[in-house]
């Protein structure tokens, strides 16, 4: 099975990078999966955590502002998908482009949205009383 992970970057300490390193290593070691990771690591900067050497990396550039950036992201994403031909695409990016992936790629592969967060984030209550009931 071929997996394509879409993540913003893995060159900083954080939960997404650590979970991704652990999960992808498990998939490769125990199931023999072929794992590809697409990042925006600014030219293949060294990942913060150690990743399995069998992972195939795809680094893309951020180009333009908002609409032009989304269009450039779509073109680069489609190129990588056509090269890799993944069985599943896992999106671990909770930014706007992460939510847009299913619309950007069409129906070629199943898309799984994986979100990592912390229960220790300070949440503010709604300021409108009718919304906080």
Outline where the language-model segments fall.
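N-terminal strand-loop element at the rim of the active site
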Residues: 6-13, 26-68
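Short His-centered aromatic/hydrophobic patch
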Residues: 91-97, 115
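Active-site proximal beta-strand in glycosyltransferases
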Residues: 3, 88, 104-121
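Nucleotide-sugar donor phosphate/pyrophosphate-binding loop at the beta->alpha transition
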Residues: 71-73, 110, 117-133
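Short, charged/polar "capping" segments at the starts of alpha-helices
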Residues: 43-48, 98-99, 121-123
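A conserved mid-protein helix/loop that constitutes part of the nucleotide-sugar donor-binding site
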Residues: 14-22
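An amphipathic, basic-hydrophobic alpha-helix
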Residues: 63-89, 98, 130
């Amino acid at each position: 099975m071929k997996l394509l992970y879409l993540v913003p970057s893995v060159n900083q300490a954080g939960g997404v990078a650590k979970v991704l390193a652990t999960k992808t290593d498990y998939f490769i070691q125990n199931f023999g999966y072929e794992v590809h990771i697409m990042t925006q690591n600014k030219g293949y900067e060294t990942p913060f955590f150690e990743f399995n050497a069998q992972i195939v990396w795809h680094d893309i550039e951020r180009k333009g502002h908002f609409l032009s950036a989304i269009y450039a992201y779509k073109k680069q994403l489609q190129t990588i998908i056509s090269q890799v031909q993944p069985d599943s695409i896992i999106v671990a990016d909770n930014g706007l482009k992460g939510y847009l992936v299913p619309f950007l790629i069409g129906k070629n592969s199943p898309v799984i949205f994986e979100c990592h967060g912390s229960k220790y984030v300070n949440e503010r209550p709604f300021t409108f009383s009718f919304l906080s009931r």
